[in-house]
Amino acid sequence: MFSLYLHIHYEILRYSMIDINKIPSPCYVMEEKLLRNNLSLIKSVKERAGVNIILAFKAFALWKAFPIVREYIPFSTASSKFEARLAFEELGSPAHTYSPAYTEADFPLILRYSSHVTFNSLSQFHRFYPMVRADGSRVSCGLRINPEYSDVETDLYNPCAPGSRMGVTCDLLGDTLPEGVEGLHFHTLCESTSYDLERTLAEVERRFGRFLPHVKWLNMGGGHLMTRKDYDVEHLIALLKGFKERYPHLELIMEPGSAFAWQTGFLLTTVVDIVENHGVKTAIIDASFTCHMPDCLEMPYKPAIRFATDAVEGKPTYRIGGNSCLSGDYMGDWSFDKPLEIGDKLIFEDMIHYTIVKTNMFNGIPHPSLALWDKDDRLVMYRTFGYEDYKNRMD
């Protein structure tokens, strides 16, 4: 009970240090202290387990924060030529790159900005490996494997579902890997536990174990949510150490994305209208689920709103509606201690990963600003967006 009191007291104290009135609306705000907490934990796991942990840009690519990230983790994983270039230019290191399919036009750029390139299929490997050799680069090539096992329950995020386009299944490989394949890569997790990884590793060894003595590295992909409060970090470290004891020659690579930015910031919005239809009250905000919080609708999941709860009978209760023309751009319900009013601020928690990298400008809705609340409790504006950003997307 005392520890719970301390946690609640700390949360109230942290909120009080952030002057919401200084922040434009809508705005994504990342908190530097929380980011550093995550980075410290990830670096500790990396060092204690003796593995290489790199940042997955597909979840978090807020490059103006990379000077902070570089203090802890200097490498990243990319899934396109643009992400690979961002890694090279802004993080200062070549990327570990994987894509479901490379093109003739893009592959020279992939080679320029990458240290590792993973191919999704044997046909892609055979098509592009001659370009790797002809380039004379020191890029290390790998194959993505599909262990046909995943604990992910949402089909949208399950790369091992029957018929998946992701990775090579064991029945397509013979007794040896093609010449030039130096590593294997699997990605089966999504905000998962170390026990999910343990079960996946067992399947990887069962199906692909014959190749492990002959490759240099094994990339375990992303989805390792090691910064979540209930994640068993000690079990993860023991699991990785045990695997390394069986395969001491292997470099083990992990590429989480959400874990870096988990619970590190929020989306500040403002109530701009309140409407009622058949007894359902909807507070319309100056942001959008479909434009600015797309995973809420895709997963779907209901985000937390600061100082709000799930619906409670007898309390002021609302749907929250996005400010787009999409009928389904809403979620709910939430209850508040007092009725909402136009002009009230609503703070959507944990909105830094898989948000900024996925936003769009549907309906010409203004994009939220980007900001950092730094470790000295100052607001640092990274970017504001305007009409030209919308117009130039279609130039």
Describe each PLM feature range:
Residues 188-189, 218-227, 256-258:
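Glycine-rich beta-strand-to-loop/alpha-helix junction loops that act as flexible
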Residues 14-92, 98-101, 288, 336-341, ...:
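N-terminal capping/small domains of soluble enzymes
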Residues 35, 58, 87, 143, ...:
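Conserved, mostly hydrophobic/aromatic
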Residues 4-16:
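Short, Lys/Arg-enriched N-terminal segments with co-localized hydrophobic residues
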Residues 239, 256-395:
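Charged (often Lys/Glu-rich) extended helix/loop segments that serve as interaction or gating elements
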Residues 51-217, 231, 239-242:
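Active-site-proximal beta-alpha core segment in soluble small-molecule metabolic enzymes
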Residues 149-151, 190, 226, 260, ...:
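Feature marks short, surface-exposed loop/turn motifs that line or immediately flank catalytic pockets
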